[in-house]
Amino acid sequence: MASVNIKPLEDKILVQANEAETTTASGLVIPDTAKEKPQEGTVVAVGPGRWDEDGEKRIPLDVQEGDTVIYSKYGGTEIKYQGEEYLILSARDVLAVVGK
């Protein structure tokens, strides 16, 4: 995972999606048009968190750089930066952290 010069704001998370499967268990090749959108990725950068209701301190996020996360199928904004594709997600779009 390369370092990226993108810093998410507030409770946003920058994720690089894991590649979708290209073949089935039996060896059939899945065409691009039939691939499901991936819902798992690696956290590349994390914002500082949102402010509490009083605006006095930040509420930290539950994920950190390097975590593998599962996120909502249609959540986030897809971006392309220096030839790589990323997803900017809100913290609420992250459903789970995959154990190591």
Swiss-Prot record:
Alphabetized UniProt keyword annotations: Chaperone, Cytoplasm
Compartment(s) of residence: Cytoplasm
Family from the record: Belongs to the GroES chaperonin family.
SUPFAM superfamilies, A to Z: GroES-like
The organism's place on the tree of life at top rank: Bacteria
Protein name: Co-chaperonin GroES
Protein encoded by which gene: groES
HAMAP family linked to this entry: CH10
One Gene Ontology molecular-function label: metal ion binding
SMART domains: Cpn10
One Pfam family cited in the UniProt record for this chain: Cpn10
GO CC list: cytoplasm
Function text: Together with the chaperonin GroEL, plays an essential role in assisting protein folding. The GroEL-GroES system forms a nano-cage that allows encapsulation of the non-native substrate proteins and provides a physical environment optimized to promote and accelerate protein folding. GroES binds to the apical surface of the GroEL ring, thereby capping the opening of the GroEL channel.
InterPro entries given in the database record: Chaperonin_GroES, Chaperonin_GroES_sf, Chaprnonin_Cpn10_CS, GroES-like_sf
